[in-house]
């Protein structure tokens, strides 16, 4: 009995230590992480290699404590370990926990192989605010090639946005395919987009200007209250979304216009269904609303692109890929940031015209599309160059005459 009690006492700190190990994930967040990453949404930070040994050491302590607990129980006499006895139950429990924590230790050692240049390892926050360890490949081409392309004689790939330039074959290289393996066909749009889509760009504050969110909210308010057509605003961060939503809410409430704002982690489906009900509603979306949602006809008639969709450079995967490009003598902006922003831009624009009878307007609130040297690349992704206007009021006036 005394030995069993000692085993019980040995197991208690093991459980407490397990909780500490979970909390120790917090220490993997590097010192000096910018506060802007933390308020809400996708809170990401690259793993600090200096904290790895401490975390693995804590797991090792836990395993050794379990091993000591097992030795304590196994030292009991045979009667205490007979079938159905408390001693045997305690032994089985300790053995099970030891096996699970050995698996955890092995998984941690695999995920924390920071010398592996083909992956990005980082910690983020889950929905409950707890720390979560992640490991993502920098490139998926090899995985796709092994899992799909080498197993089939022929594979047909189709995409409306994958090839933003004339070099269609080059677009498949990130998928693990070589140019000489690909027969590429580029087909024109089945829709007369030049007639179906109006494109305007507002020459206002740039996204990094202090007054950008205020100007964006005011502009969306003008478009929504003037046109009274379902309006989707695509943003690139929840922080900006929240700021714009707070400024828009009183304006739209006074006009009787429904406002839907996507929350971090919120699925697009329920918001999309509510938005489709019409009524000239305004939907503020990010992430999942740039692709994969379908709003034909009057379900979406005005699309506002808040800013050109460049990825956040501090995103762990983006940062790791940028580091690799620099090491290989490339330019992260030219070789990564710009191509991926163009792809996301085309995906966002694709939310508007879904059938041959749709008609709608794209309003781009980021003046860099007209001012910057790379703006021409984004303009080429549109069916026609955008007309540059001085204000949202001018845009609304033009669109009032353009819509039937």
Label each PLM-derived region with a short phrase.
Residues 1-404:
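ASCE RecA-like P-loop NTPase motor cores
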């Amino acid at each position: 009995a005394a030995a069993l009690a000692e085993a019980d006492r040995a197991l208690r700190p093991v459980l407490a230590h397990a909780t500490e190990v979970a909390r120790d994930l917090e220490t993997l967040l590097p010192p000096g992480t910018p506060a802007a990453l933390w308020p809400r949404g996708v809170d990401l930070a690259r793993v600090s290699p200096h904290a790895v040994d401490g975390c693995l050491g804590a797991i090792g302590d836990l395993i050794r404590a379990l091993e000591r607990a097992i030795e304590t129980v196994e030292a009991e006499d045979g009667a205490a370990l007979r079938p159905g006895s408390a001693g045997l139950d305690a032994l089985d429990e300790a053995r099970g926990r030891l096996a699970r924590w050995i698996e955890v230790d092995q998984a941690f050692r695999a995920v924390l192989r920071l010398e592996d240049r083909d992956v990005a390892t980082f910690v983020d926050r889950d929905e409950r605010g707890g720390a979560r360890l992640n490991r993502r490949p920098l490139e998926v081409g090899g995985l796709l090639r092994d899992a799909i392309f080498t197993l089939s004689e022929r594979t047909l790939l189709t995409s409306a946005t994958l090839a933003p330039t004339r070099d269609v074959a080059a677009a498949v290289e990130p998928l693990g395919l070589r140019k000489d393996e690909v027969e590429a066909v580029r087909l024109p749009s089945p829709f007369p987009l030049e007639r179906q889509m109006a494109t305007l760009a507002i020459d206002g504050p740039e996204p990094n200007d202090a007054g950008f969110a205020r100007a964006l909210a005011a502009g969306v308010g003008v478009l929504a209250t003037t046109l009274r057509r379902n309006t989707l605003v695509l943003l690139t961060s929840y922080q900006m979304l929240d700021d714009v939503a707070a400024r828009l809410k009183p304006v739209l409430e006074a006009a009787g216009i429904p406002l839907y704002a996507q929350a971090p982690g919120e699925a697009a489906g329920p918001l999309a269904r509510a938005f489709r009900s019409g009524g000239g509603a305004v939907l503020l979306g990010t992430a999942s609303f740039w692709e994969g949602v379908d709003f034909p006809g009057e379900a979406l008639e005005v699309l506002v692109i808040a800013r050109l969709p460049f990825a956040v450079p501090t995103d762990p995967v983006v940062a790791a890929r940028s580091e690799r490009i620099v090491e290989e003598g490339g330019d992260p902006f030219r070789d990564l940031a710009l191509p991926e922003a163009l792809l996301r831009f085309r995906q966002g624009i694709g939310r508007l015209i879904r059938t041959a009878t749709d008609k709608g307007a794209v309003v781009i609130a980021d003046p860099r599309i007209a001012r910057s040297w790379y703006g021409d690349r984004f303009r080429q992704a549109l069916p026609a160059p955008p007309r540059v206007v001085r204000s949202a009021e001018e845009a609304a006036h033009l669109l009032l005459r353009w819509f039937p």
